[in-house]
Amino acid sequence: ARKIGNEIFLFLKDKHHLPINREKSGIRRPVNFTILGFGFVPTYKKGEKGKYQLVVSEKGWKNLKQKIKTITRKTTPFTFDERIHKLKEVQQGWLQYYRIASIQEKLKDVDGWVRNRLRCCIWKQWKKPERRRKNLLRLGVDLEHSYSYSRSRMGTWAVACSPILRTTITVERLQKRGYESLLIYYQKVAPFLNEPLYTRTVRTVV
């Protein structure tokens, strides 16, 4: 492996005059290798030993979450529509770059986290207990629960993650305000999910 690696290095350097960074070049297992924000993991499919699929590196996920945190920080003076607009720009730009990676399951977790952050912003925006009570009533909560929920002593994040807001500020209601999940947009742009049917392997559905 080292001999082949050196031959490739010399070929690229001498024949094509390409600059090669020795520190970033090396011989290593795919699972220990990242490049341009991508990593590799085994496919774990029967009959596919030695095959790997492309995923997003930990640094790539960290960068995305940091940008989302900035936009959805409850103290940032954005209107809800402004947050949604900026959130779309960040999510779509990130997914356009990483669309070739296999990340569907991970996106589901991130989507849930993003929605809770949006609920947190909404709860913070309502501020006073009486305003919260009236808004909960508008969302279909009964009189008794709207009063007790609006005066909950739980923290903002705890309320956002609880049934108080998860059953009232639903995914459908967020979508009506312009929200689009990472998973839905990924399913639109991921090339291996949008190939013509005749190019895909036929699978038996049971």
Where are the language model's segments positioned?
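Non-catalytic terminal/accessory segments
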Residues: 1-206
